[in-house]
Amino acid sequence: MAKAPVKAGKKKSFKKKEKRVVHTGVVHIQATFNNTIVTISDQEGNTISWSSAGSLGFRGSRKGTPFAAQQAAMTAANKANETGLRVVEVRVSGPGSGRESAVRALSTAGIEVRAIKDVTPIPHNGCRPPKKRRV
């Protein structure tokens, strides 16, 4: 059997990620019944940092708790603090239990919250909702 030819000398060159300094941004909190996702972006919508209850190791029904949402918000805020983020506008979406605790965690992480806006999509009688649970 013939051996495969060995490629000589070409290494992949990766472009180094430049650190942007952002002072104001937008925090998107998506709070569902099963999980809470916190994304911090600049004014144009480019993501600076993100975190979720599931990515922090919470599993199953623990992902939907207010404590998990608080931890997710703290983690995302600490990552964003490294880029110099100080002032944010918060946009909360969804019916989950982690809405208030995530917003509170942002202010304790040293980020000034300028405005809180609810952007939960409400249908004008669109799709049929899922059937009611029988427990």
Curated annotation (Swiss-Prot):
<dbReference type="InterPro" id="IPR019981">
    <property type="entry name" value="Ribosomal_uS11_bac-type"/>
</dbReference>
<dbReference type="InterPro" id="IPR018102">
    <property type="entry name" value="Ribosomal_uS11_CS"/>
</dbReference>
<comment type="similarity">
    <text>Belongs to the universal ribosomal protein uS11 family.</text>
</comment>
<dbReference type="GO" id="GO:0005840">
    <property type="term" value="C:ribosome"/>
</dbReference>
<dbReference type="InterPro" id="IPR001971">
    <property type="entry name" value="Ribosomal_uS11"/>
</dbReference>
<comment type="subunit">
    <text>Part of the 30S ribosomal subunit. Interacts with proteins S7 and S18. Binds to IF-3.</text>
</comment>
<keyword id="KW-0699">rRNA-binding</keyword>
<dbReference type="Pfam" id="PF00411">
    <property type="entry name" value="Ribosomal_S11"/>
</dbReference>
<keyword id="KW-0694">RNA-binding</keyword>
<keyword id="KW-0687">Ribonucleoprotein</keyword>
<comment type="function">
    <text>Located on the platform of the 30S subunit, it bridges several disparate RNA helices of the 16S rRNA. Forms part of the Shine-Dalgarno cleft in the 70S ribosome.</text>
</comment>
<dbReference type="GO" id="GO:0003735">
    <property type="term" value="F:structural constituent of ribosome"/>
</dbReference>
<dbReference type="GO" id="GO:1990904">
    <property type="term" value="C:ribonucleoprotein complex"/>
</dbReference>
<dbReference type="InterPro" id="IPR036967">
    <property type="entry name" value="Ribosomal_uS11_sf"/>
</dbReference>
<protein>
    <recommendedName>
        <fullName>Small ribosomal subunit protein uS11</fullName>
    </recommendedName>
</protein>
<dbReference type="GO" id="GO:0019843">
    <property type="term" value="F:rRNA binding"/>
</dbReference>
<keyword id="KW-0689">Ribosomal protein</keyword>
<dbReference type="GO" id="GO:0006412">
    <property type="term" value="P:translation"/>
</dbReference>
